[in-house]
From Swiss-Prot:
This is Small ribosomal subunit protein uS15. GO terms for biological process: translation. The keyword Ribonucleoprotein applies. It comes from Spodoptera frugiperda (Fall armyworm). PANTHER family: RIBOSOMAL PROTEIN S15P/S13E (PTHR11885), SMALL RIBOSOMAL SUBUNIT PROTEIN US15 (PTHR11885:SF6). Keywords: Ribonucleoprotein, Ribosomal protein. The keyword Membrane does not apply. GO terms for cellular component: cytosolic small ribosomal subunit; nucleolus. Pfam families: Ribosomal_S13_N (PF08069), Ribosomal_S15 (PF00312). Belongs to the universal ribosomal protein uS15 family. GO terms for molecular function: small ribosomal subunit rRNA binding; structural constituent of ribosome. CDD domains: Ribosomal_S15p_S13e.
Length: 151
């Protein structure tokens, strides 16, 4: 998929293994993986951070192949899912950091332009999540209250 606000085509990506079966050398069962997700979710880790932890320390390449569900679905079933989707959360966090930078550097025109691009991405993503009913229909991004969302 191409980039939204950059000329890059975005061709490079990691390839998933062709086989969707669990590797024979993996000793963890689906219940063990779900238990690990529960422990890491209790600590406040995001689904992508949990996936990295499981991959690096437990050798679970794809949680979906082992458990049959994605990490976020498992977290939702356990009641540990974040209230804001992860990609939207990090875009808001980036916008808050850019606003803080612009308060200190008022003449930074390029950062002001990039902030407009980031905020347009936030609005676009919020519109998508409203149609998928992940966010409530009356949810609105406001720059004044954004720092409270990511704090």
């Amino acid at each position: 998929m191409g980039r939204m606000h950059a000329p890059g085509k975005g061709i490079s990506q990691s390839a998933l293994p062709y086989r969707r079966s669990v590797p024979t050398w993996l000793k963890l069962t689906a219940d063990d993986v779900k238990e690990q997700i529960f422990k890491l979710g209790k600590k406040g880790l995001t689904p992508s951070q949990i996936g990295v932890m499981l991959r690096d320390s437990h050798g679970v390449a794809q949680v979906r192949f082992v458990t049959g569900k994605k990490i976020l679905r498992i977290m939702k079933a356990m009641g540990l899912a974040p209230d804001l989707p992860e990609d939207l959360y990090y875009l808001i966090k980036k916008a808050v950091a850019m606003r803080k930078h612009l308060e200190r550097n008022r003449k930074d025109k390029d950062s002001k332009f990039r902030l407009i691009l980031v905020e347009s991405r936030i609005h676009r993503l919020a519109r998508y999540y409203k149609t998928k009913s992940v966010l409530p229909p009356n949810w609105k991004y406001e720059s004044s209250t954004a720092s409270a969302l990511v704090a």
